[in-house]
Amino acid sequence: MKKGLFFVALMIGAMGVKAQVNIQEMYDFNRGHLTTTLEMFKGDKWGSTFFFNDIYHPFDMNVPSEYYTEISRAINFWQGTKLAPLSLHVEWNGGNFASNSWLFGVEYFLHSSDYSKRLTFQLMYKEISHIVVHLVDYIPLQFTMVWGVDNLMGVKGLQFSGFLDVWGSGDTWVNPLVDPTDPVETTHWVMLAEPQLWYNIGQHFNCGQLSIGGEVEMSYNFTGGWHATTNFYENKGFNVAPCLGLKWNF
């Protein structure tokens, strides 16, 4: 799951530019596969729209095996007032391995005077529609923090961005290789964070759209990833998954 464009998008929207699109290709060292991510943001006078789509490419399969999508709308038709940093937020996310979810809430955006440092907080009600796993007494809330810093430590073209999600869950962990109906353990909270570091290497050869970098996916009891359909146990507890890749800004 990626939200790296979100803060850049907020900056772009605030500066009057209408849209931004990028594509990323990452190699996941833990899972041993490539992930293609497409991100898009569009700002308007009523707020902004953001989406991304992750597509997983296991090397032992001839076609992409799994996908995950998030699309969100920030509603803010009071831009230019003292309440401009505060927006309403509505979001849908899901995929062919993940449960569909609707989220409703608010977000608050902070930034430096030149928008080179950005931070947003979101608090949302989350409604999960589970298909494979079951829900048992969960708190239907999600807290999200997203950040972005341009020219990190004074290095031109070095960007540090990422997000942290914490949400209530009622997942009953099962092992489909043994018995899909056998409940093993219930988790009530899930955490996912993906700090990213990108360097605009293309600035050195007249190709400013190209960046090189990567991310570290840090999670707790997160069932995401194409391998979740074969082994739910793999992501129980705390896990770290480093990734390396390229990004192209259109």
Predicted stretch roles:
Residues 22-28, 32-77, 81, 85-89:
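Transmembrane beta-barrel domains of Gram-negative outer membranes and organellar outer membranes
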Residues 25-31, 55-59, 90-96, 123-129, ...:
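Transmembrane beta-strands of outer-membrane beta-barrel pores
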Residues 32-36, 63-69, 98-104, 137-143, ...:
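Residues that define the transmembrane beta-barrel architecture of outer-membrane proteins
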